[in-house]
Amino acid sequence: MGIFDWKHWIVILIVVVLVFGTKKLKGLGSDVGESIKGFRKAMNDDDKPAEQPAPQPQQAQPAPQGSPLNQPHTIDAQAHKVDEPIRKDQV
């Protein structure tokens, strides 16, 4: 039957209710339910073919010269060995 018997689950449930309270558990349950609904909706939306909007002509804008985001860069550095402290339980 595993580690937990039905009696163990009842005790765990009582402890959880005492710690968190019914109000917080109710809010948690509704949040989980909404998350599941959103997930199912997203999965169903993925199954439907997406309507392709007509492509809008875009004007090509030249990238500014010297843009740091588009330029490759290299970082020159050396690694330094760090002395690890001696653990007391290994002595």
From Swiss-Prot:
Keywords, comma-separated and alphabetical: Cell inner membrane, Cell membrane, Membrane, Protein transport, Translocation, Transmembrane, Transmembrane helix, Transport
Taxonomic superkingdom: Bacteria
Biological process, per Gene Ontology: protein transport by the Tat complex
Localization terms from the record: Cell inner membrane
Bias type Low complexity, positions: 51-64
GO cellular component: TAT protein transport complex
Region (Disordered): 41-91
Coiled-coil residues: none
Biased composition (Basic and acidic residues): 78-91
Transmembrane segments: 1-21
Disulfide topology: none
InterPro entries linked: TatA/B/E, TatA/E
Membrane topology of this protein: Single-pass membrane protein
GO molecular function (one): protein transmembrane transporter activity
Known role: Part of the twin-arginine translocation (Tat) system that transports large folded proteins containing a characteristic twin-arginine motif in their signal peptide across membranes. TatA could form the protein-conducting channel of the Tat system.
NCBIfam families hit by this protein: PRK00442.1 (NF001681), tatAE (TIGR01411)
Family stated for the protein in its record: Belongs to the TatA/E family.
Subunit: The Tat system comprises two distinct complexes: a TatABC complex, containing multiple copies of TatA, TatB and TatC subunits, and a separate TatA complex, containing only TatA subunits. Substrates initially bind to the TatABC complex, which probably triggers association of the separate TatA complex to form the active translocon.
Protein name as it appears in the record: Sec-independent protein translocase protein TatA
